[in-house]
Amino acid sequence: MKKIMIVDDNYLSAEGIEKNIDWEALNAEIVHICYNGTSAIEAMKKESVDLIISDIEMPDLDGISMSRQALNINPMVKIILISAYDKFEYAR
């Protein structure tokens, strides 16, 4: 079973991702929900995950910086970055 981490400072967004996807049908489970990038990195140091779904814009440690650190911890982790912001720079 694949281990998934959700990282989003917006509780409703994180909960929406967790509850609206049939993770079991995908042979996956949510092992961590973190509300900032720093807690995500701390969780990764304790338990390896296969996929991180993360917001880009977060206080403390943004999703892009968190992704760089996560890849240093586990170069094989897959990362999906999401955002509700209309900033084209992120798409580049």
Model-inferred region functions:
Residues 41-92:
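CheY-like receiver
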Residues 6, 33, 81:
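Conserved SAM-binding loop
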